[in-house]
Amino acid sequence: MEFLGDSQNHDSSETEKKNKKKKRFHRHTPHQIQRLESTFNECQHPDEKQRNQLSRELGLAPRQIKFWFQNRRTQKKAQHERADNCALKEENDKIRCENIAIREAIKHAICPSCGDSPVNEDSYFDEQKLRIENAQLRDELERVSSIAAKFLGRPISHLPPLLNPMHVSPLELFHTGPSLDFDLLPGSCSSMSVPSLPSQPNLVLSEMDKSLMTNIAVTAMEELLRLLQTNEPLWIKTDGCRDVLNLENYENMFTRSSTSGGKKNNLGMEASRSSGVVFTNAITLVDMLMNSVKLTELFPSIVASSKTLAVISSGLRGNHGDALHLMIEELQVLSPLVTTREFCVLRYCQQIEHGTWAIVNVSYEFPQFISQSRSYRFPSGCLIQDMSNGYSKVTWVEHGEFEEQEPIHEMFKDIVHKGLAFGAERWIATLQRMCERFTNLLEPATSSLDLGGVIPSPEGKRSIMRLAHRMVSNFCLSVGTSNNTRSTVVSGLDEFGIRVTSHKSRHEPNGMVLCAATSFWLPISPQNVFNFLKDERTRPQWDVLSNGNSVQEVAHITNGSNPGNCISVLRGFNASSSQNNMLILQESCIDSSSAALVIYTPVDLPALNIAMSGQDTSYIPILPSGFAISPDGSSKGGGSLITVGFQIMVSGLQPAKLNMESMETVNNLINTTVHQIKTTLNCPSTA
């Protein structure tokens, strides 16, 4: 009996221990929940003092208050994500329906001029789509393991092998299609553009790819923030003000395996940092930099083309926080003598604190992308700090490695090797100028310098500015060496350094547009060259087409704080009766780095009246010509590099039948213009 009693006592003690081990749950009262919700709506992150006050008021432990707010924030984030997903799904369905309707309309469209059906290009794009989709079947074991070893310092093994990749040329992945019309940037449709691939990213990525990309992006962001926040000895001053990376200190701070498989003699490294204040709020700036179409419109002189291949993470709604995109970009210098640089990058945005964002770009080895320029982008990007007065402070870092497959032209060696061609200073200077331009675009009143009230309304002013921006974008594509335009190189660099390309005209079914460009050096400062070329009073001294007749400015729109940044409508005097209806639209601009543009196009009077009345200008035909001016980068200083480009229409000829007469015409036009500029400025002909 005693044994049995001992057994019962033992069982009861075990039961008590089990009861003690059970978790005790506490359900808050409706009053407590109501008070907590009220506080949460006012402040989602209460400090310790507020939590202690709530603890005393509601009779809860501070730890319970802390956990309640953590759980409530997680719950609200999940609700927002579900709402975002539903909204995106609805928008995707709407776009899909619109796409189907447009395709059906195109199938049954009839040309009003000839009555024939348009050429069906669906088969071409279907083929490209199939090639891109088939390229997803690749050997993930080797690729992912090598990338992980390079960026994360450890390989990833035991992955299921897939099919070998099918390489797709960058030409098939890029597109430079019509621009979109959005809040700040004007809609445009370049005459050099072609039917674009779908703007919505349609690349399917595995979860393993997404996880790897996220790890690489987070690591790159950490490196970028250290580069932004660290000064000497990591960064050293050159030329008194420019920040250049000390590569030895950098390699000691950041260790990684080589990207090029060993040191090569023709391998170059560029790393620079610059900062400035821009006239745009931080949220708007982040939105522009995270959108590939807006980015191309914002930097037409730098970004030749850009496309988002995949959205790994869309980020928080409204501010792009934690957004991660896989993108392809091609960067250019406005000259036929400098090859472009192509990158496949991960672009990651992170909100560092309230009013501060960081955006990082880092190269990613993607099988479908084969860079012809063999360029590599180390963690680069910018830090954007909102200044609460409509301005933002931007600090930019550019860090890249490139292989010179062909020697850089002697004329451009200094600006390329010193980082002036692709460096941070150029990005900041261009960003400041373009933000001023787009702010002026939104100004409700026309400029006080508008001569004679020719532009009658704010809508007319904005329409003219959009047309001018399309003109600038078209010119930048025509003089560069982008691989992603549908242009054909008719004649490479001849003995005068002139390159001629051709493409089909959007506005003339049987017409071809010839684009000729060359670069030359002048021993004169960029500011003086800019003042000479933009002044309508000196225009007859170099403009072959003006035939020496004087030119008058009939309308003027200011484009920024620099008085030289403006859009002008010019009219020639003593012109023949057939030219009375022809005017010239010109945009001139110069930034803090002394890089300048003077671009113009002839526009007939009826078309200009359409623009001045505020109507759509996307169908007005333009053939931009003009000049791109930059410092020569020489230590002696004072010289300028000028790229001149002309476009002419050739009717009734196919690309293979372009005759020598057309080639001679455009070559003579450039040679005569360059000769007259040098003669007027008292420069030797060999300069």
Swiss-Prot record:
One annotated GO molecular function: DNA binding
Chaperone found in the keyword field: no
Region (Disordered): 1-32
Tissue expression profile of the protein: Expressed in apical meristems and young epidermal tissue including trichomes and stipules. Expressed in lateral root tips, the L1 layer of apical inflorescence meristems and early flower primordia, carpel and stamen filament epidermis, stigma papillae, ovule primordia, nucellus and embryo.
Free-text disruption phenotype from the record: No visible phenotype under normal growth conditions, but the double mutants hdg11 and hdg12 exhibit excess branching of trichomes. The double mutant pdf2-1 hdg12-2 exhibits abnormal flowers with sepaloid petals and carpelloid stamens in association with a reduced expression of APETALA 3 (AP3) in the epidermis and internal cell layers of developing flowers.
InterPro entries in UniProt: GLABRA2/ANL2/PDF2/ATML1-like, HD, Homeobox_CS, Homeodomain-like_sf, START-like_dom_sf, START_lipid-bd_dom
Subunit relationships: Interacts with BBM.
Protein name: Homeobox-leucine zipper protein HDG12
Originating species: Arabidopsis thaliana
Lineage of source species: Eukaryota, Viridiplantae, Streptophyta, Embryophyta, Tracheophyta
